[in-house]
């Protein structure tokens, strides 16, 4: 037992009180073999005894780091002294519930990897997560991170997890690669307004049905929402605008989403990548915001799009000699009044001359 922090004061016959140093040998009744809420221990000094209660936690903490977790416990509440949870601390454990303490700042790589965790309570003090924390946590149904101070959701945070609901904090700026890969039970998610980046395959093959994107987002990486079979709607919200000339939705971002019927492009996006909506036949209408300055090869070909509204006065640039920007059977491309001739003479757009008119 470590008696650091135990302060004992003795009252002597002369009426004075003095600090008394206590050694482990003078303590009885203590056992750390099992966690208990209250354990009575007794100090014996020169024939005098004093008893008091202590709580035995199922964890060991050294210098603020969780160093050991006793096995065989379904629920654990971490003591307030824990500042960080190290790599693989609960990996493969049979624990069902963990209450993370206020004061906890970071959680290490694979901390709960392949565990049976069902419920976890996150503190307001949490600032940093490392990768793969809830990888293969099939029993985890909800993760409420909304009160934390996280700015980044790391790569592979919830890969193959059973999460049905994830609430993200307003402080979040980045969702890293494959953060929600194959989360088949996740149905909806709202991306916080401060998020600027969604990483490679972040939501690939997830079960989401609707997504709300902030208008200030500047990077949606390749295959971010690739093959989401239940995705029906992607909408935008917010007044934040970022004037980043490289802001881009990258290639194949929404390819293979057969139920997608509505897609809104965030206002800050400047470049639309190759094969952006490939294979999506339910979408029939699309609006391209005025900030879009470039549309890459076959961005909207192989889709069900029939009507397009392009809000830019200047035609978005096309660099390919053979563009395949829209389906051959598109019925109309509406552009601003006074810009019809610009579009009809612009590279790529001239392939659709007889479809271009004003809105």
Indicate where each model-derived feature is located.
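Exposed beta-strand and adjacent loop surfaces of beta-rich binding modules
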Residues: 3-7, 38-40, 330
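Serine/threonine-rich, repeat-prone extracellular segments and beta-strand-based repeat modules
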Residues: 16-52
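Short, aromatic/basic amphipathic alpha-helical patches
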Residues: 321-324, 341-353
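Interdomain boundary/hinge segments at the C-termini of tandem beta-sandwich modules
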Residues: 54-58
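Solvent-exposed, low-complexity, repeat-rich "mucin-like" stalks and linkers
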Residues: 1-18
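Consensus positions within tandem repeat domains that build extended binding/scaffold surfaces
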Residues: 87-89, 108-111, 131-133, 154-157, ...
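Extracellular/surface recognition and adhesion modules
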Residues: 8, 41-43, 64-66, 78, ...
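Structural signature of tandem-repeat unit edges
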Residues: 60, 70-84, 93-106, 115-128, ...
């Amino acid at each position: 037992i470590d008696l650091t922090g135990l302060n004992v004061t003795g009252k002597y016959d002369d009426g004075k009180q003095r600090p008394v140093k206590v050694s482990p040998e003078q303590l009885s009744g203590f056992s750390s073999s099992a966690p208990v809420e209250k354990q009575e221990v007794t100090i014996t000094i020169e024939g005098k005894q004093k008893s008091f209660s202590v709580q035995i936690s199922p964890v060991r903490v050294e210098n603020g780091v969780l160093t050991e977790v006793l096995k065989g416990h379904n629920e654990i509440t971490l003591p307030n002294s824990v500042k960080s949870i190290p790599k693989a601390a609960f990996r493969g454990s049979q624990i069902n519930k963990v209450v993370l303490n206020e004061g906890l700042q970071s959680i290490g790589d694979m901390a709960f990897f392949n565990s049976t965790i069902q419920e976890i309570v996150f503190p307001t003090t949490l600032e940093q997560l490392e990768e793969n924390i809830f990888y293969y946590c099939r029993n985890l149904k909800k993760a409420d991170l909304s009160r934390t101070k996280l700015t980044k959701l790391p790569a592979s945070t919830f890969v193959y997890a059973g999460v049905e609901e994830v609430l993200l904090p307003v402080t979040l700026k980045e969702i890293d690669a494959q953060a929600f890969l194959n989360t088949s039970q996740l149905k909806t998610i709202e991306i916080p307004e401060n998020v600027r980046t969604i990483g490679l395959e972040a939501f690939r093959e997830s079960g989401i049905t609707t997504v709300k994107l902030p208008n200030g987002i500047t990077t949606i990486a390749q295959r971010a929402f690739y093959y989401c079979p239940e995705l029906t709607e992607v909408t935008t919200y917010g007044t934040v605008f970022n004037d980043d000339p490289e802001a881009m939705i990258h290639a194949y971002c929404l390819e293979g989403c057969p139920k997608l019927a509505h897609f809104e492009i965030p206002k800050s996006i400047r470049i639309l990548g190759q094969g952006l909506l490939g294979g999506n036949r339910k979408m029939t209408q699309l609006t391209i915001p005025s900030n879009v300055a470039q549309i890459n090869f076959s961005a909207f070909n192989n889709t069900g799009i029939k009507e397009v509204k392009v809000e830019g006065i200047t035609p978005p640039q096309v660099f390919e000699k053979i563009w395949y920007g829209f389906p051959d059977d598109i019925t109309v491309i509406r552009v601003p009044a006074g810009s019809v001739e610009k579009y009809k003479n612009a590279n790529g757009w001239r392939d659709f001359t007889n479809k271009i008119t004003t809105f």
